[in-house]
């Protein structure tokens, strides 16, 4: 269960931006709120509002990048391989991600900062008995451990500067970091198309019914200055290159 996500210095996001599922004191629709324990009250859903080019999609992109670095292709980096770093305006300072979540009844806080070449900072805390406890922290190559220290020291020595310790420790089946890793793998999911559904949108415009009206309304709300959209069919000549066999026959 996601509680909070924080991103700083990613794409159009310069300063710290926070998505929080923590509920306010408003009692409206209280029956729909989530209660993971006696103290926490969370929202079941939230929406991100903002003007065009305000960075809404980049917040989601930051979450996807964080997951990609933990359980995706970017987690499989070799020593010296570049990380997916996209800082604001070409700045040189590291990008930071942090995720707060609950998995199997335990609260976790995991975060890291990085640039294209290395991980500068990384940390994982949990609250197994309602009290904060450090699993590991890492800053400029210096690690700190409070649990299973000897094994973690060995694993940290095997972790290159450009790889997350959460990833490498799970490669070696460290039990202390397994649950946090599994949350990213199993629970953090994204339901969105990577490419725009152009053909579907065109079909809705051609239909000319309520679907087109809805599209025009969305364009109006976006304040793009577009009042109508029409589809025009045009004919064109399609040229295909002859196959090598056809070229031999024509000689």
Regions found by a protein language model. Name each.
Residues 7-34:
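N-terminal pre-Walker A segment at the start of P-loop NTPase domains
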Residues 109-237:
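Electropositive, glycine-dotted interaction segments
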Residues 7, 101-103, 126:
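Short acidic, glycine-rich loop/turn motifs
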Residues 239-251:
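Single conserved hydrophobic/aromatic residue that forms the stacking wall/gate
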Residues 9, 52, 59, 219:
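Conserved RecA-like P-loop NTPase ATPase core
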Residues 34-41, 45-47, 51, 57-119:
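Conserved P-loop NTP-binding catalytic core
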Residues 2-3:
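Extreme N-terminal starter segment of soluble prokaryotic enzymes
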Residues 12, 103-107, 129:
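Glycine-centered tight beta-turn/hairpin loop motif at sheet-sheet or coil-to-beta transitions
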């Amino acid at each position: 269960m996601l509680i909070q996500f924080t991103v700083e210095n990613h794409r159009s996001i310069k300063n710290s931006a926070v998505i929080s599922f923590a509920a306010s004191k408003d009692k409206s629709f209280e029956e729909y709120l989530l209660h993971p324990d006696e103290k926490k009250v969370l929202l079941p859903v939230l929406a991100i509002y903002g003007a065009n080019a305000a960075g809404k999609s980049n917040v989601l992109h930051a979450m996807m990048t964080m997951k990609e670095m933990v359980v995706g292709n970017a987690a499989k980096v070799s020593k010296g391989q570049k990380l997916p770093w996209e800082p604001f305006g070409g700045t040189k300072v590291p990008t930071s991600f942090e995720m707060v979540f609950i998995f199997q009844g335990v609260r976790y806080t995991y975060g890291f900062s990085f640039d294209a070449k290395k991980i500068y900072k990384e940390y994982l805390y949990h609250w197994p008995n309602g009290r904060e406890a450090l699993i590991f922290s890492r800053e400029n190559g210096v690690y700190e451990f409070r649990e299973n220290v000897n094994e973690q020291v060995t694993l940290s020595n095997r972790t290159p500067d450009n790889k997350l310790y959460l990833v490498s420790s799970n490669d070696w089946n460290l039990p202390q970091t397994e649950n946090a890793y599994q949350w990213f793998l199993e629970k953090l999911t994204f339901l969105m198309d990577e490419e725009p559904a152009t053909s579907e949108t065109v079909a809705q415009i051609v239909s000319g019914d309520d679907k087109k009206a809805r599209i025009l309304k969305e364009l109006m709300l976006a304040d793009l200055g577009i009042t109508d959209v029409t589809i025009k069919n045009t004919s064109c000549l399609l040229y295909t290159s002859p196959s090598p066999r056809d070229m031999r026959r024509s000689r």
